[in-house]
Amino acid sequence: MKQVIQIRCKNNKKSQKVEIGSTLFDIFSAFDLKMTHGPVSARVNNKVEGMHYRVYNSKDVEFLDMTSSSGSRAYTRTLFFVLCKAVQDIYPATDVVIDIPVSNGFYVDIRLGRPVVDEDVNIIRRRMQEIIDARMPIRRFTVPTEEAVALFQEKGDVEKVKLLKTSGSIYTTYYKIGDYVDYYYGTLLTNTSQLYLFGLEKYYDGMLLRIPSLKNPDVLGEMTRQDKMFEIFKEHHRWQSILGIRTVGDFNQAIDANHSTDIINISEALQEKKIAKIAEEIASRKGVKLVLLAGPSSSGKTTSCKRLSIQLAVNGLKPLQISLDDYFVDREKTLKDASGEYDYESIYALDLDLINEQFNALFRGEEVELPKYDFQSGKSKKSGNKLKMNDNNVLVVEGIHALNPELTAHIPQEQIFRVYASALTTILLDNHNYIPTTDNRLLRRIIRDYKYRGVSAQETIHRWPSVRAGENKWIFPFQENADAMLNTAMLYELAVIKTQAEPLLQQVPENCEEYAEAYRLLKFLKYFKGIPYNNLPPTSLLREFLGGSSFHY
């Protein structure tokens, strides 16, 4: 007699008995579910698993499609796998680096020893399509880590060997397409035929791998030029070469060699050098009266503003700092979003008329009294703080909407210098596994919300999708308007954040949806060796989130 287990399916709120050891694909078929763009993965007791996964105990299961972040990641990782196999098939001795998310896709550095040309891209694209059309199964293997290390040593994959040796894991999962072997952090699809849409184009010195849009998986994400953003990534690559650290394996080896203090000091010095350079550029522009500093949530705007103000003072200017948070309209005047919640992410939550009126008055040499927004009462009040600008004063204004043209529509543009700050992670797990640029911002916010606002990690994770939606609508479209960009991510920061975030993530209960993201982040942080945060200087931007800063917030 066959043994059976009980599965509760969240998609249709039905229960059904299935044979013990059934794969998630078997279970999906048993429930006779229909998904246009899936399933690509599933939450099993709120842990994301691939459709290869076999179930041996009664579980709650929710199947995910391409409109979910977890599903989109599984699809994207599988595209990486097929791309790397295609390159190996055509150029066997060539290294491939899945580098950075840019232009709604991923920049791919292919090291041919010569410039990449259009024909290279066309050949690789055709080979990828052949692999997809061949409907090749993607097989999953779990072995002792030392066995996986030996496998990748034999392949000559130095970066994976370094990562796995320092991961601390007893067992490691790897995947195969045909005879091609690779390791990926996270779930993959089960067959190459599930990759129904992709794009591959020449982009700068490499290639751009394009993926389906999260909002509409029937089309590729819109390709947009992000020249300034791309330059910031390249700048950080140069910084990494100074430190000799490109991947987490490199980083962990440096920590084991007791180089953590050097890494911190050099990283902080490089960031301060960049801030000083921006200040010099501002000072060299005659007539600039307003410095606008924008960036997404937890990008470190406040500390960046304070450090930039210090460097402006070094250049002979007298900065006056203003936060756009004090220009919110009264709560009852705030527009609501589709869910009926007050939409504080919208630029129309700010009193745009008052901003333009007061800034122009200041530029004319008049005295103004700044407002102060009371977040508890939801009311704008007079602050008693009066400002008047002299010839060598400059306003330094920070806020998420600072680069939106509507904010300063009535201010002469020659008086404005725009700075965009964001935490763009450039360290890689290894050459085929990138780190999402949003992960360190989410982790920063989890720590800050708990430490300063009494908000749990579960609640911060719950709110994060709406924060991201607001950024996509109100912040990212204007980032290329910046005169200068500042990457606030520190090479070492995830090693420090690990020590503060892990206890908070461990408090997220298993029976809530947010557990899936908490579990993913905990699994991800395990790759990093920890660094105590008391090693950071008091002016470090990270102290805005971790505490112990010499700045007053």
Predicted segments, located by residue:
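Hydrophobic positions on the alpha1 helix immediately C-terminal to the Walker A/P-loop
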Residues: 304, 308
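Glycine-rich phosphate-binding loop used to anchor ATP phosphates in small-molecule kinases
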Residues: 356-414, 464-478
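Conserved nucleotide-sensing/catalytic segment adjacent to the nucleotide-binding pocket
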Residues: 320, 333-376
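Auxiliary tRNA-acceptor-end handling modules of aminoacyl-tRNA synthetases
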Residues: 53-73, 86, 95-273, 278-285
